[in-house]
Amino acid sequence: MLFRICWLIVILVTTLVAELLCCRVGALFAAPFFLCFYLVVTCNWQIGLAGGIIACVVSEVVLSRSFTALPLLALLVPFAHMWRHNGDRRHAYIQALPGALFGLSYATWFVVGENIVLWPLGFRMAVGESVWIVVLSTVCAAIGFPLMIAILDGIASLAKLPVFCQRSVG
């Protein structure tokens, strides 16, 4: 049990570091969504939701965001549960599809939200800048999610824990 808790802490820190690194280049990396999706498919929906909530809250506190993405996270869990039973987990190009979808939704959520919070005209982002952030975030997510799965699977396989790519259907 203690070993699994340590594993969860390691993958939580890994995902948050990935998000911070992508933020340095101007992309909103959907690391809490990726962690939630990974844990729901690999373990179960309770662990996935708890890990996603912790990652989301820590990410928002560290990055000083104005509001939360927890409502979107709640929508992600049924999708991940469906993917657990029906989705293909072994190919990176298939893994890039939910990655791009999560990146697009995460970036759009925060860009629109920040523009609403910064309502006075002088403080909002320009449309071109907003679109650039969403596009860059989607591309980073489509590339980053399969990479993150490979890294987290490597950590899990060293620890003899269940891995995403070898999880049997059902």
What is each stretch, according to the model?
Residues 1-170:
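Terminal, non-globular segments
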